[in-house]
């Protein structure tokens, strides 16, 4: 059923269809499902905000963490905070009411910030892949990845993300309620007159999904070959090789985490786009959409767990300058120092 700025393609045996901007959507699923959704969003907020905020605070507090590589990682934390503050707070409120009580404006805000965070994350991972490729594979001789390159990389992620998220606000496609009708996303569902949804979805999938993923897979494919060759030839010291491998492993795990979170959503969205008019249940889009939102917590958790130097700095910040686990963290800085001088980034 299509109405002004909404579309409900779900299997609906009740025969009742009401605007998700005006009425609770309890005819789609049991009200308990909305309560569970609200609880899930509350969990993402109470975990996602402090973890990402601490990532920013600790990096700004400790000068040794302000390295070019960490600029991109900080960018991921900022993107996650945008998702938490601008998107999750909106969704928890709407799920408590069972419909998008905030109207079209709230839908645009939630859809914009959720999509913005995802796009910044994907393009940041593409920039990280390029950085790792340049540092480890050295396709450009005597090139040193410095602060200016990192700033350019961060600027690129925002430019590309805004190029994907702003058009639906100004008429090229639109944000509409999806799934259980209490969160919003790009309109993959309709060919609504005047919005050119088809051209936007094709543009989005090609320019803002296929291209960055191709960059990521190309760079890491070349990088894995280079790491094996360097290890076989012993071209660098064992300490440097170990440090570079640790950074590369961390970023690859971030990429895998992104794919696990966002690939189901992208696949379902593409299926809906190519099967417009088909009917499906309300959970078909809800589950992958809200699973994708968990990406706001996995990046900082991966960074904290796999980065000894950052973990040490965070512990000393939390314990007022002392590290009660000093024995476990000992030697982290010395392991990373040589790689920092070799690659012009601090891998940890």
From Swiss-Prot:
| Superkingdom per UniProt | Eukaryota
Q: Where is this site: Plays an important role in the conformation switch to the active conformation?
A: 110
Motif 'Ionic lock' involved in activated form stabilization in this chain: where?
A: 131-133
Q: Which InterPro entries match?
A: GPCR_opsins, GPCR_Rhodpsn, GPCR_Rhodpsn_7TM, Opsin, Retinal_BS, Rhodopsin, Rhodopsin_N
**GO CC list:** membrane; photoreceptor disc membrane; plasma membrane
* Annotated GO MF terms: 11-cis retinal binding; G protein-coupled photoreceptor activity
Question: Looking at the record, which segments are called Disordered?
Answer: 327-348
Residues bearing attached sugar chains per UniProt? 12, 197
List N6-(retinylidene)lysine occurrences by residue: 293
Q: Which residues cross the membrane?
A: 34-58, 71-93, 108-130, 150-170, 200-221, 250-271, 284-305
Which Gene3D superfamilies has this protein been placed in? Rhodopsin 7-helix transmembrane proteins
- CDD domains of this UniProt entry? 7tmA_MWS_opsin
Where can this protein be found?
Membrane; Cell projection, Cilium, Photoreceptor outer segment
Q: What keywords are assigned to this protein?
A: Cell projection, Chromophore, Disulfide bond, G-protein coupled receptor, Glycoprotein, Lipoprotein, Membrane, Palmitate, Phosphoprotein, Photoreceptor protein, Receptor, Retinal protein, Sensory transduction, Transducer, Transmembrane, Transmembrane helix, Vision
Give all cystine bridges in this chain: 107-184
Topological domains, Cytoplasmic: 59-70, 131-149, 222-249, 306-348
Q: Which family does it belong to?
A: Belongs to the G-protein coupled receptor 1 family. Opsin subfamily.
Record's function text:
Photoreceptor required for image-forming vision at low light intensity. While most salt water fish species use retinal as chromophore, most freshwater fish use 3-dehydroretinal, or a mixture of retinal and 3-dehydroretinal. Light-induced isomerization of 11-cis to all-trans retinal triggers a conformational change that activates signaling via G-proteins. Subsequent receptor phosphorylation mediates displacement of the bound G-protein alpha subunit by arrestin and terminates signaling.
Protein name in UniProt: Rhodopsin
Originating species: Sargocentron microstoma (Smallmouth squirrelfish)
What's the gene?
rho
